[in-house]
C-alpha cells in the first residue's frame, strides 16, 4: 500500500467512527474530537480512547485504558499485529467498557 491508499483507508475508517458516534443513542455521553489525524473519544468517567494514524508504518494505533494496539490493513479490515483481533471489535469492546454500556461500531 502506498501513502495515498493508506490515507484514503484511514480517512474512511475515521468517517465510519464519526458517523457511528453521531448516531449513538445510548445513555452514556461519548464526545469525540478529531485534530490532525488523531481522534480522541472522551467518556463521562473522564477516561479517553485515542485513535491515530502512523503514516510511516501505514498503521492505525489505538490507545485505551486496557492498553495500546497497532493495526495493519489486511484485505478489508484493520488487524492487530499482536492479537490478530479486528480494530472494530477491539474498539467496540473498549468503548463498551469505558462507557459502561454496549457500544457497537460496524
Swiss-Prot record:
Coiled coil: none
GO molecular function: ferric iron binding; ferrous iron binding
Keywords: Iron, Metal-binding
Keyword Zinc-finger: no
One GO BP annotation of this record: iron-sulfur cluster assembly
Domain of life of the native organism: Bacteria
GO CC annotation terms, alphabetical: cytosol
PROSITE patterns: FRATAXIN_1, FRATAXIN_2
CDD domains recorded: Frataxin
Gene3D superfamilies hit by this protein: Frataxin/CyaY
Protein task: Involved in iron-sulfur (Fe-S) cluster assembly. May act as a regulator of Fe-S biogenesis.
Annotated NCBIfam families: FeS_CyaY
Family label: Belongs to the frataxin family.
Name the UniProt record assigns to this protein: Iron-sulfur cluster assembly protein CyaY
Organism whose genome encodes this protein: Pectobacterium carotovorum subsp. carotovorum (strain PC1)
Record gene name: cyaY
